[in-house]
Amino acid sequence: MAQPGMGLTLNGIAQGYLTDRIVDILRANGCDRVLADMGRSEIRLVGHRPDGQAWRIGLADPLSPAQVAVTLDLADRCISTSGGYGTKFEATGRHHHLFDTTTGTSAGHYIAVSVVAASTMVADALSTSLYVTPPERAGRLLAAFPDAAVLVTRPDGSRHELSEGGKF
């Protein structure tokens, strides 16, 4: 790295990829019901709960993390949430690890982006990509992932589904 203290993280895709690989190993060894949670931001759900119902997942409110903002019932799907609240460079949180692709500064379009997809790697990469992409360019990015469901939380706390189909 160019300066002391600089670092590089592959969390924008690595956790999702590893989650998928771990679940592949579990499935290859006979596990047909799996809830794989890799640190609260990437979750892969295989099959249904033992009672036959879909897995119930609660998404924390990024403005009040002890509160559940949205509850989803999912089976054979994956979810990833990206937000600037994870790794902060200073106490206010204005400067964090997710950079706007057009300005090179910490992205501030949203405070959280959650994506439901068939692959955890796709959900992980897409949630991070959408978080750092200016909103006016999000539609073009989403067009390549028609099966993904996307929920964004804006800085004022309002939530909006970017994807079609009402999966949130």
Enumerate the language-model features and the residues they cover.
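Mature catalytic core of soluble alpha/beta enzymes
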Residues: 1-168
